[in-house]
């Protein structure tokens, strides 16, 4: 083996569910001496976030095809070809020994460019249902991994890489030992919030009274409206914040979480060891439902499809969970987590890299 450090190009963009797991793997390999660059788009979150982590980023121009008009669809082959050409030029300069596709539109032309240059392609699918880009790229990938069973029939289940501060939380039986008082309910709608959570949970609080205390993350621009909803329900004491910067501390505080079931959220909740009520985002492929199903099947969570997420149903569910029941659910959540997901993905990247 030569003395030159190995080179990895991470292809991921668009949402935190793609970008944060990619960052976890990148940092793990950088600590082992790898050189890492990122392939993304200039108008999505990776453009600002990745450089803050000390990683250089290259941009190509590409966007999704879902929901586009006929004119855009007709132009798609040319746009994909141009993005492939841009990605190919970037990779010829950087000369990665392996590329890691973590999802997002950028992975499509990026993966094809790597394949055309003879560079090994490693794919990681974060969701319980594979995205369109990864479905297509799996046909040319060197290896495919998945966070949850079912996305690909023969791919290894490795979990989702999650933040180290979440992994470092004490086990549920330690963290929750001796807790009493109101049940602590953490409501998380993501950075954009979730209207159904913002509208429903203040009324749930009114039904449950002083048996619960709520920390509600409302999403951008919704804090005042949600605070007013709690006050209007006679429950002004509950905490409402627009964002939560330190999710590990919020998980440590909580007894139960009410949230959407994006892939990274589900994986973090399992790693933290927390019971959950999941409200999957309504999408035609039911991606978030399939993300949450393993935890429900393990007895660690309950799924409410959005039409069933009513004040009565949620209040009755929370009221029916004793502290003993919540601890059992928390332990089950932790038991199905894969805390070494980052190491598993990094190990596969190392294994297939060109020598």
UniProtKB/Swiss-Prot annotation:
CDD domains in alphabetical order: GT28_MurG (cd03785)
Gene Ontology, cellular component aspect: plasma membrane
Reaction it catalyzes: di-trans,octa-cis-undecaprenyl diphospho-N-acetyl-alpha-D-muramoyl-L-alanyl-D-glutamyl-meso-2,6-diaminopimeloyl-D-alanyl-D-alanine + UDP-N-acetyl-alpha-D-glucosamine = di-trans,octa-cis-undecaprenyl diphospho-[N-acetyl-alpha-D-glucosaminyl-(1->4)]-N-acetyl-alpha-D-muramoyl-L-alanyl-D-glutamyl-meso-2,6-diaminopimeloyl-D-alanyl-D-alanine + UDP + H(+)
Record keywords: Cell cycle, Cell division, Cell inner membrane, Cell membrane, Cell shape, Cell wall biogenesis/degradation, Glycosyltransferase, Membrane, Peptidoglycan synthesis, Transferase
EC number: 2.4.1.227
Protein's pathway: Cell wall biogenesis; peptidoglycan biosynthesis
Gene Ontology biological process terms in this record: carbohydrate metabolic process; cell division; cell wall organization; lipid glycosylation; peptidoglycan biosynthetic process; regulation of cell shape
The keyword Cytoplasm appears for this protein: no
UniProt GO molecular function: UDP-N-acetyl-D-glucosamine:N-acetylmuramoyl-L-alanyl-D-glutamyl-meso-2,6-diaminopimelyl-D-alanyl-D-alanine-diphosphoundecaprenol 4-beta-N-acetylglucosaminlytransferase activity; undecaprenyldiphospho-muramoylpentapeptide beta-N-acetylglucosaminyltransferase activity
Membrane topology: Peripheral membrane protein
Primary localisation category: membrane
UniProt-annotated location(s): Cell inner membrane
HAMAP family cross-referenced by the UniProt entry: MurG (MF_00033)
Biological role stated in the UniProt entry: Cell wall formation. Catalyzes the transfer of a GlcNAc subunit on undecaprenyl-pyrophosphoryl-MurNAc-pentapeptide (lipid intermediate I) to form undecaprenyl-pyrophosphoryl-MurNAc-(pentapeptide)GlcNAc (lipid intermediate II).
Similarity comment: Belongs to the glycosyltransferase 28 family. MurG subfamily.
Protein name as catalogued: UDP-N-acetylglucosamine--N-acetylmuramyl-(pentapeptide) pyrophosphoryl-undecaprenol N-acetylglucosamine transferase
Origin species: Salmonella typhi
Lineage, highest ranks first: Bacteria, Pseudomonadati, Pseudomonadota, Gammaproteobacteria, Enterobacterales
Gene field: murG
